[in-house]
A protein has these predicted regions:
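Short, well-ordered beta-strand segments in beta-rich or mixed alpha/beta enzyme
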Residues: 2-9, 40-67, 88
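An amphipathic, aromatic/His-enriched active-site/gating alpha helix that lines ligand/cofactor pockets
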Residues: 21-37, 56-89
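Short hydrophobic/aromatic patches at helix-to-coil boundaries
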Residues: 91-96
Length: 96
């Protein structure tokens, strides 16, 4: 069953550009992963500090592989000091 994830990143004030760049650079190699069905990045219109990554994976195993790949590990190490809340990743299944 396909897995859809929503990752929420709340940038520290003044780190918006760095978070944006890190996210945009991270989604490029993720799109090439065999289990990735699609991945997009979003920036909130109402809160300039808030970013999202929406992704779809072939299944949960594909997402687990993604989470362990070097480019994902590097991205998390890069973005973690730039955000002021713990990273929130919701794993969901489509219901309609």
């Amino acid at each position: 069953m396909a897995l859809t994830t929503f990752a929420r990143f709340h940038a520290r004030p003044g780190q918006e550009r760095a978070v944006r760049v890190a996210i945009l650079e991270a989604i490029v190699p993720a799109r090439e992963e065999p289990g990735c069905l699609g991945i997009q990045a979003y920036h909130s219109i109402r809160d300039s500090l808030l970013f999202y990554i929406h992704s779809r994976w072939k299944d949960e195993a594909a997402f687990e592989i993604h989470a362990e790949l070097p480019h994902t590990v590097r991205f998390l190490a890069r973005v973690t000091p730039l955000i002021d809340h713990p990273l929130d990743v919701a794993r969901t299944e489509q219901i309609g």
